[in-house]
Amino acid sequence: MKSLTLEQIIKLHDDIINKTSGSYGIRDNKMLKALVYCPFQTVFNKECYKTDLEKICKLSFELVKQHPFIDGNKRIGAHILLVLSKVNNLTFQYSQKELSDLFLKLASSEYNYNNLLNWIRGRVMNVK
């Protein structure tokens, strides 16, 4: 799977804040670093998140829930979902309202990781 570095994620976050307003900065640098590697963790030499889609959803979800940035955590979570899907040749159909509603539900804990994964699986057109 093609992934993003910590520096790339921070740059994307800064770009989002530039375009949409809000506060710059990282609230918890150690947490952010951990989140970047979270989708690739193993237990007893077995991947916790086996598919590209599971890894992408895990990073996106944790960016929203763990709130590593001062502002824009839902926005960067959604953007990472879209960017990583694109660079890994995954396409899915959605409306902007559906995506916005999804990330609001994630942030409010109305939805969890499995809800996000199932939402994407229901809309994905090609899965690795």
Predicted region positions:
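FIC/Doc superfamily catalytic core
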Residues: M1-K128
